[in-house]
Curated annotation (Swiss-Prot):
Family, per entry: Belongs to the UPF0512 family.
The name this protein goes by in its record: UPF0512 protein M
């Protein structure tokens, strides 16, 4: 859809991401816009530059700071379809 392929190039350029994003089901970005997608790179690591991408299509947030998506620093996509857009814990 309207999502660029730059997500894979960004994950490749960080190095710290490894294959976390590229191995994920990217269809979730296009089809599950009632779900929550959370990227948290921890304090000063991982996805530190993604703060400006929060709110892609209402899906959720991209946050590389010390606060935002939660307490995990695992760089894993969390899709919470049950909660949906009525209750966002993210960013």
């Amino acid at each position: 859809m309207g999502y660029p392929e730059s997500i894979s190039s960004i994950s490749n350029s960080t190095g710290s991401m490894g294959s976390s994003i590229s191995a994920s089901n990217l269809n979730g970005f296009a089809s599950n816009d009632n779900s929550i997608s959370c990227f948290d790179g921890g304090c000063g690591g991982g996805l530190g530059g993604w703060g400006g991408l929060r709110g892609w299509g209402g899906i959720g947030g991209f946050n590389g700071g010390c606060e935002g998506c939660g307490s995990s620093n695992t760089n894993i996509i969390n899709l919470d379809i049950d909660i949906g857009r009525s209750h966002r814990r993210c960013c």
